[in-house]
Amino acid sequence: MSVACVLKRKAVLWQDSFSPHLKHHPQEPANPNMPVVLTSGTGSQAQPQPAANQALAAGTHSSPVPGSIGVAGRSQDDAMVDYFFQRQHGEQLGGGGSGGGGYNTSKHRWPTGDNIHAEHQVRSMDELNHDFQALALEGRAMGEQLLPGKKFWETDESSKDGPKGIFLGDQWRDSAWGTSDHSVSQPIMVQRRPGQSFHVNSEVNSVLSPRSESGGLGVSMVEYVLSSSPGDSCLRKGGFGPRDADSDENDKGEKKNKGTFDGDKLGDLKEEGDVMDKTNGLPVQNGIDADVKDFSRTPGNCQNSANEVDLLGPNQNGSEGLAQLTSTNGAKPVEDFSNMESQSVPLDPMEHVGMEPLQFDYSGTQVPVDSAAATVGLFDYNSQQQLFQRPNALAVQQLTAAQQQQYALAAAHQPHIAGLAPAAFVPNPYIISAAPPGTDPYTAGLAAAATLGPAVVPHQYYGVTPWGVYPASLFQQQAAAAAAATNSATQQSAPQAQQGQQQVLRGGASQRPLTPNQNQQGQQTDPLVAAAAVNSALAFGQGLAAGMPGYPVLAPAAYYDQTGALVVNAGARNGLGAPVRLVAPAPVIISSSAAQAAVAAAAASANGAAGGLAGTTNGPFRPLGTQQPQPQPQQQPSNNLASSSFYGNNSLSSNSQSSSLFSQGSAQPANTSLGFGSSSSLGATLGSALGGFGTAVANSNTGSGSRRDSLTGSSDLYKRTSSSLAPIGHSFYSSLSYSSSPGPVGMPLPSQGPGHSQTPPPSLSSHGSSSSLNLGGLTNGSGRYISAAPGAEAKYRSASSASSLFSPSSTLFSSSRLRYGMSDVMPSGRSRLLEDFRNNRYPNLQLREIAGHIMEFSQDQHGSRFIQLKLERATAAERQLVFNEILQAAYQLMVDVFGNYVIQKFFEFGSHEQKLALAERIRGHVLSLALQMYGCRVIQKALEFIPSDQQVINEMVRELDGHVLKCVKDQNGNHVVQKCIECVQPQSLQFIIDAFKGQVFALSTHPYGCRVIQRILEHCLPDQTLPILEELHQHTEQLVQDQYGNYVIQHVLEHGRPEDKSKIVAEIRGNVLVLSQHKFASNVVEKCVTHASRTERAVLIDEVCTMNDGPHSALYTMMKDQYANYVVQKMIDVAEPGQRKIVMHKIRPHIATLRKYTYGKHILAKLEKYYMKNGVDLGPICGPPNGII
């Protein structure tokens, strides 16, 4: 059943291929001009209407076949469907059944779930493409802004079969447009059932509007309408030939639950062979029904799923599992790539999407790349020469079918372009041309671009982070040019190595973006190409010899337009016509004699030690894992030519001329290999083959603290000597103190010195899932895309992925706890042990394991907490181990923001001898420690936990003699003096009492001194406190009204002798009304009423009741005052019963007036409480009837 519907005023044909009332008639010819849109909803039980081609479908597993689909019954609820898809009843469907259903290509795409009358006119494909493109752009903008970081590409358990449509019942696992955030977007009267999937178990009311919470509506349109991608089931056979229509039915019967991946499914995958399943329409490599749920449309917002499991099982080696899965694929003949005109893989122009859908095993049947016959692939897929070779035979395959398809499409759509064919094409995607020295860097290279012919430049190169751009200065261009002069037959002449041999990283034409002139090595038949490349390299080298560096430039000859189509026309697009300069001129890139050395290296490569494809490490071909001595006859002093390493310095040697990719200049013989360090086993060629910028192991034999290795591990491929540099650890970004991004194209930022991390991030694709079209951004190897924005890697720093390049579970770089020296110092200043501990790599670390690092841990925030917790329950031996390390530097820890807590713990939990030993370390520094923020805490702990009868305590206290007042007025020292008064015997504190003579009033009004006065009154002997109290009584009136002195007077009233209290009360009498209205003195009056004797209390209360303040009594004035009302309340509380009755009778006449004042209400509340408590009739105290107070 098909009908033309309107979605947001975009017309489209909706065809239902799953209605139980329909059957398909194959006699109708297919019309390629009309897209067929299938939905996954089950057809409602509607009344069948008479039609010539109406019948029952074969079943839910029926696959759509070419033919027409007749008219079916209406849905059970027209209103709800019409709300979204309004039918234009005036239009007619031309041709009846033939016009309605004969639009089937190799496979139907999207059905609708509603059986609408096929009585409307369909639109042409051009119109639909135009409308959907506009809708896709709108939906893309909406999706980029609104979709949070959800796990999008994942189906639920109910996804049994059926193609995936754009209007899906439950497209995402977690709804990105949840009803809680966008409740107004929920369609009216449409019930959404979250548990339902987007297949035949959906119903009519699961049809969604463009504003419903399924999210990604426009996103789906872009991916399923605009792209005629082979991402459908036609790719399940692995080849590019036309797919059989009946194979879809077989695949549907074998579809499995896509929620999780358990053990028995691994066996099913092996039986399936090369059948490729898909998740939401995207093919998955080698038949693995993997969750590609880690893709996030918000960069860097990638979340791990709780049920995300290792595809290969918990106990299986990751590489072995991959090897088993890859081995199930048979080799595909070249003929499978013949019919590609109707298929393409356009790249989304608005989003960086690395496409890794295809992995094929070209084991032995592929035509060699360097053969004189047709060049079929970008890489050599002979089984003996693989990109990685591991003991468990993990074959990491790089596939070039997607690029071949682009060239095929370009040749088909642009027949005027010569030299492009599906089987023979220019292998290098772009040309890097070295402009002659002294010329304009932005116009040089145009001739090379015109001469070298069309090459593909994906337009994403101008939108990704600098790590996706390959500077020409990373590689030695003379070596590439010289290698081009050698015959490609020489490269193939050596015997093939056996399976267990270390295989070869190719630096020739099989690489995607490589050096400026390495495209020669597979194309010796093109003299123009060879001549242009050699000339440009020689000009570059001559300019360097003359001291005039040239500019490496990027001369694009082709690009992908915004729809993903390949356009081979140099300079046709704005912004791409002129060469793009990649790196600033670098006079230290290449030596003038590099070409001669490379010629000899290439000549010797036929008789090399590793399968004949690499003789010395200087040549354009490099064997993995071989670390050979490199005799260099062309060494030059560094005063003539500095180090040619791209990131590094030449501070170690006078004759260093190392051209390693990421290394310092070394004191070893120089080397001119293509971007390799002197003994590195993985270099720029691997980074280029993986589509990345820097999976390169740098020169790891030379020692310098100002650089770090980018890949460090203990596998056989990456051996490091004992004098190697300090590695990072498990992860690329290992420390919070690192800057996340060194800068554009690896250049250090102005604030980063030579010791800063300058190694680029890992490759765009790590081992196991690489494609030459992976242009979108960084991935961690398991298909999870991560953002290259600074700081975005934080959430992946501790995440463990099954095949991540730097994961502890990775088999390529296996982790080892003690694979490094513990004395290694990180650029942050911390040792690697502490750095790993801070990154939670050692959750069960013990005190004995940090021996030698106690001081460092003690001065770290997390390390100090670790030691504190361990010391509380540590054994005596463990405490002694820690104590031995901290004793010699105890003072340093005492004044440290974190170390002082470790010293305090020893005063709490250490042995008596340890406490005394630390106290001896304090002696001589008591004053300085007492005035220091952290040292004062240590002294207080020592005074508290060391018995006061110890001589060391008395000696410590005596050090403050002569500095008492200075300490008392200090914000830190006053705490030490207070602790001394509290913990030390009073006889030893007489010097403090003597220091206070004549200073009591001044100290009592001091914010810190008032505290010390109170401690003296609490703990000192009476004969010591007597002179202090005498001075206090002389200044009672002033102290009562002082913001600090009133606390001293209150303290005397609370804890002093009765005679001292009476003296203070005598000072208050006669001034109760005035002092009660004072902010500070009112507190003293309250204490007088509370702590005075009964007689004195009665005198104070009577004074308030009998005194008049103008026309009113003093009581009335006090009840209205913001401070004095508290004095009245206290009087009511503490007064004798008879006196309380007098007070209440005095208050009663003023009740009506008190209701007007905020503080008067407090008095009324107190009266109500009293009357209710005693059962007295409230009388007029109750509020008026209108409730106004």
Curated annotation (Swiss-Prot):
InterPro entries documented for this protein: ARM-like, ARM-type_fold, PUM-HD, Pumilio_RNA-bd, Pumilio_RNA-bd_rpt
Protein encoded by which gene? Pum1
Give the Omega-N-methylarginine positions (modified residues).
Answer: R797
Sequence ranges of Polar residues compositional bias: 512-525
Q: Which CDD domains match?
A: Pumilio
Locate the region Guanine-nucleotide binding in RNA target: 1082-1086, 1083-1086
Q: Which UniProt keywords apply?
A: Acetylation, Cytoplasm, Differentiation, Methylation, Phosphoprotein, Repeat, RNA-binding, Spermatogenesis, Translation regulation
Please give the knockout or disruption phenotype noted for this protein.
Mice are viable and grow to adulthood without apparent defects except that they are smaller than wild-type mice at 8 weeks of age. Males mice however show significantly reduced sperm counts and fertility: testicular hypoplasia is observed. Heterozygous knockout mice manifest neurological dysfunction, hyperactivity, and progressive cerebellar signs including gross and fine motor incoordination. They show spontaneous seizures, abnormal EEG activity with generalized epileptiform spikes by the age of 16 weeks, and have smaller than normal cerebella.
One Pfam family, short name? PUF
According to the record, the residues making up region (Disordered) are: 22-73, 233-272, 491-525, 614-647, 743-773
Q: Which organism is it from?
A: Mus musculus (Mouse)
Q: What GO MF annotations does this protein's record show? A: miRNA binding; mRNA 3'-UTR binding
What modifications does the entry list under PTM / processing? Phosphorylation at Ser-715 promotes RNA-binding activity. Following growth factor stimulation phosphorylated at Ser-715, promoting binding to the 3'-UTR of CDKN1B/p27 mRNA.
Compartments annotated for it: namely: Cytoplasm; Cytoplasm, P-body; Cytoplasmic granule
**Known function:** Sequence-specific RNA-binding protein that acts as a post-transcriptional repressor by binding the 3'-UTR of mRNA targets. Binds to an RNA consensus sequence, the Pumilio Response Element (PRE), 5'-UGUANAUA-3', that is related to the Nanos Response Element (NRE). Mediates post-transcriptional repression of transcripts via different mechanisms: acts via direct recruitment of the CCR4-POP2-NOT deadenylase leading to translational inhibition and mRNA degradation. Also mediates deadenylation-independent repression by promoting accessibility of miRNAs.
Task: State what protein this is by name.
Answer: Pumilio homolog 1
Q: According to the record, where are the Pumilio repeats? A: 849-884, 885-920, 921-958, 959-994, 995-1030, 1031-1066, 1067-1102, 1106-1145
